[in-house]
From Swiss-Prot:
Coiled coil ranges: 28-169
Ranges of biased composition (kind: Polar residues): 237-246, 509-520
Skewed-composition ranges (Basic and acidic residues): 364-379
Residue span(s) of domain FERM: 997-1333
Domain MyTH4 as annotated: residue spans: 832-986
Entry's Gene Ontology cellular component terms: cytoskeleton
Organism: Homo sapiens
Name recorded for this polypeptide: Pleckstrin homology domain-containing family H member 1
Location of region: Disordered: 184-266, 296-321, 356-395, 487-529, 546-568
Amino acid sequence: MAELKVEAPASVDWQKRCLTLETQLFRFRLQASKIRELLADKMQELEQRLLEAEQRAENAETQVGVMEEKVKLSNLKNVDSEGSLHRKYQELLKAIKGKDELISQLEAQLEKQKQMRAEEAKTVQEKAAKIKEWVTLKLAKLEMENQHLKSHNQRLVEQVGSLQDALEAIQIAPSRKLLVPPYGAAEQDSVPSEPGIQPMGQDSGSQAQGLKAAVLAPSPGALQSKDSVSEAASPLEDSSSSTVHSGETVEAKPLQPHLGRESPPHQPCMKLLTFRCSSASWGEGLVTAQRGMLPGTKTSAREGGPGSSLTLPKVRAPGTPRDSIQLAKRHHSQPQVGHGHFGRVVNIETEAFSALHPSGLPELESRARSREEPEKMEMEEPPPAGKNEERESPKALGAELEEVELGNKPPTPPLHQFSSWESRIYAVATSGMRLSDMSPRSNTACCASSPPALVSPGSFSGLVYKNVTVPVYTALKGRATQISNMPFMDESSGSDDDCSSQASFRISVPSSESRKTSGLGSPRAIKRGVSMSSLSSEGDYAIPPDACSLDSDYSEPEHKLQRTSSYSTDGLGLGGESLEKSGYLLKMGSQVKTWKRRWFVLRQGQIMYYKSPSDVIRKPQGQVDLNSRCQIVRGEGSQTFQLISEKKTYYLTADSPSLLEEWIRVLQSLLKVQATGPPALLRGGTKPTVKGWLTKVKHGHSKVVWCALVGKIFYYYRSHEDKRPLGCLPVRDAHIEEVDRSCDSDEDYEAGGTRRLLSSHCTLVIHPTEHSPTYLLIGTKHEKDTWLYHLTVAAGGSSAKVGTAYEQLIGKLMDGEGDPDSPLWRHPMLCYSKDGLYASLTTLPSEALQTEALKLFKSCQLFINVPVEAASVDYHVSLAQTALQVCLVHPELQSEIYCQLMKQTSCRPPQKYSLMQCWQLLALCAPLFLPQHHFLWYVKQQLQRHADPRSETGQYATYCQRAVERTLRTGEREARPSRMEVVSILLRNPFHHSLPFSIPVHFTNGTYHVVGFDGSSTVDEFLQRLNQEIGMRKPSHSGFALFTDDPSGRDLEHCLQGSVKICDAISKWEQAMKELHPGKSEGGTRVVKLMYKNRLYFRSQVKGETDRERLLLASQTSREIVAGRFPINKELALEMAALMAQVEYGDLEKPALPGPGGTSPAKAQHLLQQVLDRFHPRRYRHGAPAEQLRHLADMLTTKWATLQGCSPPECIRIYLTVARKWPFFGAKLFAAQPAQLSSKENALVWIAVNEDGVSILDHNTMQVHITYPYSSVTTFGGCRDDFMLVIRSIPDKSSGKSHIEKLIFRMAAPKIAEATFIMASYMNHCTTTVNPPTNPPGACQLWELDGRQFFSSVSCATKGPTLL
């Protein structure tokens, strides 16, 4: 550039030109520097690559050398191995040749097999064609025979008609009264006998016998149509029942057991009515007449004794209860037979009718006999060997031979047949469902040795059951609804109209037939909607609300009723509500606990009731003065309510929910109180932040009220016991501040009765937006600070200016949205302190609670600073339980202990065991309860800051995070942690397990299964996990439930409801045991025992049973048999014991001489004795001599040996098949004594509760006295110290009346509660099955009924001083 010579004109600006060139020079230098840098980088990269290339070259040279050496070595080896390779080659060639030869041989064999199979298939096809041809010919022949029999039957029908005309010509009036109902009247259950029957003469009797024999003899035993059978049935029955021998007595008798043995047990054979004649000559004349009438007629009828029979078509066993009912309705005209019994006949002897028992027992028995279990579906049980053959006459055998000779023997169909030993067990079971007769001596000794059925609860009752209350349930809309959680007392809900009840408590209620004949049934009363039962003098008892749809003839729709409910326009109360009302209500009677329909009138502060509206001019049957001491309590599900006066309690309900609400609203307005109901916390279960007595002042009016701050709403109540508030005040965005006075003068307070607050009271004002201010007068400064702080936080104001210093720091952190870099996290107030506290960290409403907070901190310090050792772990268990129990008793301290533990875990010096034990105590707190609002936010933030999977403290923080989230989802606990829970946290690392605790669950067969759970697991979650692991269905299908044993060691079990926490149940059990055994050491060796047993049994769920369910059901049934609560005779007891022995111990090993290969006789004898003790009824062995016991063991050995090779599932199937033949299989039996009998008589009965109803069984024979279906049960539960059952019988068709019966039984209190809850569960399950509810309010689930009885005396709020 220096060489360039630029000739520029004089006008060029050289200065600018110089600057431009300097700028370009600067740019060139920058580019040059960049180029140098890039060049240097490139050179360095190339140098690096050069070094790497040189390194790779050296490595390659090294590898080349190595490979050359390997090649040299391999060449040497190849030279040596050429000979061995040649030998291997030759060996492989030989092996290939051998394989080829084997393949050729197999191919040849395959071809031969193919040819053989083709020939066999051809042969089978030929045989099938022959069989088909034979079947076709046989069917044609049978069809021809059927036509012949039909024509023959038609002739016989004509003969029957002529003979009937002849019989009618013989005027035998007395005997006509005993005629069997015709085919059209099959719905009648029985025909009562007439007392005025005149005996007939001998000649006329003989003539009638001959005529009847002529009618009955020619009945063929072939398959007939329904029409032909029905045509022949009615005249046959008329003629067969028109003759009564001289001196005979006709009476109604229940069905005998032998009827069930003449056909398979699962058929409804008990519906066949059998008439017997007591004269021996009757049968002889009948057989002679038969032989004389049709000498050449072939018949397939088999006779089962004297008399003749009808041939009936084959029918299927009813598969549903409806089929059973239909068969039961037509049993008079068309008896049924079992599967495959075409030629089996039914005797119609003339001795007595088998009348149906009024209790419904035959229906149960027929249902049990007709029920087929899934294990033997589509199978047929053969009759017992030697049973039916003995009853068959030679003529019947000849008839069978003639039937077989009709053609060639057909091929045997491939039907399932039981093995011999299985058939033997079923044969024994047909007659074995009863108790064997025992000698008086052994029976007396057995009864004396058995524990008494009615025992007093003893000392255990005073400790655990001291607050147990047996509830009372009633049937409302088909569901069991609790109307009282206390037993009924005779004087409760009493009234003047109850005094007219009869002593026997049997009251008549007219039915619709009697109403129509009543003179009071005017059309005007009908149009008014007034029930005729309420107008008549006999209408004391109303239709229960579950069946409360009044007859259409006597009621109108609700919007048309004019007299069932009416208001008065006089005397309007608050808000315009009428304080006078009249209408119909259903009232529970005092003696017979059933619903009575009464006309109630509310007037002038009194409520009176009459029998009908027309009786209002008379003296009322009862009246209640409504004053301030009266109380209204809603019942379960808001279907009933209680009116509690000073003297009595009235249980009331209405015809509809709307009428019920109207009455409650009017009564509330009159009493100026809200109806209390079941305890229900507001806002979805949120507990109050702060509560206490305050004086509320608004518009110059003051009132002392009980106040509670729940969430963002301020509630105030009349008293602390009320569940419904007088009013509420929204606090969100309200202005909260402290003022000097809320009124102008002290005289206002004096007039309001608040003189004690004048000198020292503090005042807060709540001024919501768009509302007038409300003033709160508070007695002490501590209370004022507490209310001010919590109201300010609820209002959404800044909490950094109210509360303690600790709370203000938390408020500042919340205002900063929890900034992790904020220096406030390391503030000394929030961090670890070696010294003790001088004041509480949170605002507490009283000095006593502040003192308790300081003591709580000292307890925590002792727990943290003393090292945990396994030998002395009970010291830390006691400290943790005591500290947490104080927090449960005083919820105000729950946030305090969280703040104390958070303070001691933050910025703590690395002293391992102290920090770990602090986190352990926090891990015990998290499942129990949670802090309030902003404290909960602070705890979550701290846990998030400390969570770290790499350190042990970080893993504890993660565990606490999970525990806090679980507590938020499932709710808080009720009891302090148990010893098992504390020890598991202290000695095991809970963060290593998702379920840190585990406990064994015991089954009825002696096994157990260990199940894991956490601190928030409920019983439902626990059972869901258990069912998944052992292969069972959910409890609503299987009927199983979880039970605990009794802390006292007595033979009592407690069912756990589904919402109970497992840890709470264990803790309450431990507390109860400590109260029972106060002298024992803290770490007792005995722990709670959980049992999984069947509680409810549903026949509709049998098809889905799993193998584990069947095993447990069989084991539980075996225990019932051993305890004497299952009726089986001695022979069947041995069969059942042998089956259970095969399940439990497998095949029986025969005793041999002592040696390595056999079982010693002593060991075998011990095994047999063990089987007898576990599976054989005690009553059959008690007091028996040694020789008899040896004989029993020998018989058991014989029966057990026949089960050789039978698998346990097969034995269980047979066991349950036999056990289910008893109609009350799965029912729960309770020993009770009827209260009508004196205690000296000691006549015990069994109360059997199952899904069909409640049955009363004889205590000795276990035979049914009577059965009450749930549809007839009106009220049940506790009555004083006894069990009460109120029954409404089905109206009698003849008289049109039903009866109300009140039954009282003496039982122990736990058994009364268990029976009551099981009945309620069955009733509600049946209702849910028929009509699934749409989640009615207040409806309890199936498994939540009996949880109220569990350890009620050990509540969380016990033994703690009131520090407020």
